[in-house]
Amino acid sequence: MTTNNPFDKVKDVLKSQDQTYNFYNLSKLQDPRIEKLPYSIRILLESAVRNCDNFEVHEKDVENILNWENTANKVEIPFKPARVLLQDFTGVPAVVDLAAMRDAMKRLGGDPAKINPLVPVDLVIDHSVQVDVSRTVDALEQNQKIEFHRNHERFSFLKWGAQAFDGLFIAPPGSGIVHQVNLEYIAREVMNGTGNLLYPDSVVGTDSHTTMINGLGVCGWGVGGIEAEAVMLGQPMSMVLPEVVGYKFVGKLPDIATATDLVLTVTNELRKKGVVGKFVEFYGEGVSTLSVQDRATISNMAPEYGATMGFFPADENTIDYLASTGRSNTKIEYIKNYLSSQGLMCNYKSQSHPIFTTTMELDLSTVVPSLSGPKRPHDRISLNSMKQDFNSCLSSPVGFKGFGLTADQIQKKATFTFKDKQYTIGHGAVTIAAITSCTNTSNPSVMLGAGLLAKNAVEHGLEVAPYIKTSLSPGSGVVTEYFSHSGLQEPLNKLGFDLTGYGCMTCIGNSGELAEPLAEAITKEDLVVAGVLSGNRNFEGRIHPLLRANYLASPPLVVAYALAGTVDIDFETTPLGVSKKTGQPVFLRDIWPSKDLIQQTIKSSVLPDMYERVYSNVNDGNKSWNELKVPTGLLYPWDEKSTYIHNPPFFKTMELTVSKRPAITNAYCLLNLGDSITTDHISPAGNINRKSSAARYLESKGVKPEDFNTYGSRRGNDEIMVRGTFANTRIVNKLAPAVGPQTTYVPTGELMFISDAAEKYQSEGHQLIVLAGSDYGSGSSRDWAAKGPYLQGIKCVIAISFERIHRSNLVGMGIIPLQFQPGQNASTLGLTGKEQFNIELPTDKSLIKTGQTVKVTTNCGKSFETILRFDTPIEVEYWANNGILSYVLRKLLH
């Protein structure tokens, strides 16, 4: 049931290039509070006004947003994003769920065709390609062949989805990285809907770095796959109206600093500030000196600094970027006219600015060349402190900034033979150097900077050691076009940075294997070797299992460290080598390109027709994609033999009516965890360990170890993913004596794989909980980090704090998030994890309130109070329905 929109009275007409458009004109509300609102909140306001029907979106919601100054962080609002963005690791399980929902819809007597996206959905296949082959001119071709061999089942399923679901566009493998493709091609900036109705573009994506689009002035952030599926099916998102931190930029970046240095600085500062669950909106004259690509780099890492968004309102630079990337003049004109008419066009040089919850300031001129690491993206180190910091980490106690080595261990070296030559390496040896990730490959200034540095190095005859795994994996074919046009691909190739693929690759751990002699040497001497990458995450175990120190850096610094061969170097005092041209030592400063030269190269080599040429072919696919044979029809014909695509159990026993959720009594603790447990720890994306439960399952199905592929590629199969839950080899569980995916089966004291213990608990009818520290679930927006625990029988997670997306995912799967009271944790309460737990939460949903106190008791006589992290009333409904998808399915059936 819907009613007429009470705000139709503010509908207005906009003329642009002889075309007439309609829009909901916020100025016609004649409310002085609008001008004070942050730009990001104005976009939420427009959505509420346009979608108001007093059923899903109410007039009270509009008033709450107008009154943001007094209601921020106090009220819940509905939000209807304009579109949904997927990548294949999270997109495959989303489409699997939609296919399973169609089956359930038919079983329960409904129309399966009702399960169809109601908003545009774009899926870019970018997570499957790996750096199997590198340092050769045909690496791209070889890696793509291997990718199709490994993933033909998944790709076939996605191709079926493209024809089965209306409004689902799929960019085939090799198109680029989802967020760069979104920035350069997919993003509309302003949507043109039915009846020429204009409204702001907005997006939610099943990848936490969806925020990259904030650099273009588009509202967008990462959500769990299950929440995205609900949005696809027309369900408004329920969210707490966020506080907005205003971050003022003054001055401009010094010549030697890059956008990467800036984002690592911003990430460090905002993590210290604490912005989880908040919007960050950038303002001040300094912003006007940054290109859209610079801004997108900063927005990309919003998950790393903890914010829901890192938002840059649109300005003239935004309009120029749209033109430079080949958007049509007609679109650009109505975009500019609409944003100006709607009060969404920003003048960063203006002295006036919106009211913010709180403000911060950064003088851009103070930014210096930087890296972050060795284990977290917000642990920034200035380049001139890098050598000292790394050596300090070697001897410091094991932790985020320590490896706990003794003085004797620090002296260890390893000698090995590679391609008939002997090499000796020590701690800090660079073994992976990757120009990777949409964070940086979308930005011509740092990419061409790397190319120019490579050119200068080659002119001096400098080389990169052949055992170092170097790779170049840009986020779109546009990079290849401008590298080719500028002549800079050739020097990069000479240093080993041949094109390896268009996808996430090393940034998400798809780094492939190291050379065998090198890997054996590292393992034998237990060396702390390093990776240097232009990515956005460096959590332990993510980039490669053998690399314990990983540093985020700009593309030019990636090339520099590859040349150096070690992170244990002071570039100011130690040369990269001796010039074959002059016979003199060559320092980094001698080959670092000037900002003027970089800008000249951008002007001459990055051309609008490159974007048009690359993206005009995106719908055509490639030969391998086009030759894929796929089934047709509304319902997917599940193949029980498939180890990639499997009909999940989420809806198989679901009934039309809702049953009361059972009480949690005498539950055992499956894991007792510490701080900063990431979604990589909970549901790894990388290679499947040959000794794991998932490996045993695959072998039982006749899959050879060389064909195991990665956990990320297997997310369409629940049987593998439940066995891969908590299977990270670096997970630290206090119920196990050593690091790794084991736990104690409490009833007998037996040590076993976590997944085996979960299966044993379930077979004996025991409920499960997890104890955890702060920032539980940080990292990627990985729905299997909630689906896996759900299938393992985990009913509740008790933590000091939760990362935003993961908390939402837990609720979306019907798992209860409980938060310890301030100052308390498992240790202070004397909990070992060997107790049995009773969670005193009412089973009647009408008795449950958001944020209420929930008492937990144990069989040892201990009791403590926790905070229920159902943050909005609708989340109580999701839990009562055993998850958001069951809730939506029942809604569609009724």
Curated annotation (Swiss-Prot):
Query: Which GO BP terms sit in this record?
Result: intracellular iron ion homeostasis; tricarboxylic acid cycle
| SUPFAM superfamilies documented for this protein | Aconitase iron-sulfur domain, LeuD/IlvD-like
Per its UniProt record, the required cofactor names are: [4Fe-4S] cluster
Q: Where does [4Fe-4S] cluster bind?
A: 438, 504, 507
Q: Extract the Gene3D superfamilies matched here.
A: 6.10.190.10, Aconitase, domain 3, Aconitase, domain 4
The EC class name is lyase
Q: What is its EC number?
A: 4.2.1.3
* Keyword match Isomerase: no
Asked if Metal-binding is a keyword of the record, the answer is yes
Query: Which terms in the Gene Ontology molecular function aspect does this entry carry?
Result: 4 iron, 4 sulfur cluster binding; aconitate hydratase activity; iron-responsive element binding; metal ion binding
Cofactor note (record): Binds 1 [4Fe-4S] cluster per subunit.
User: Organism's domain of life?
Assistant: Eukaryota
Q: Which UniProt keywords apply?
A: 4Fe-4S, Cytoplasm, Iron, Iron-sulfur, Lyase, Metal-binding, Tricarboxylic acid cycle
Protein name as catalogued: Probable cytoplasmic aconitate hydratase
User: Species name for this entry?
Assistant: Dictyostelium discoideum
Which gene is transcribed and translated to give this protein?
aco1
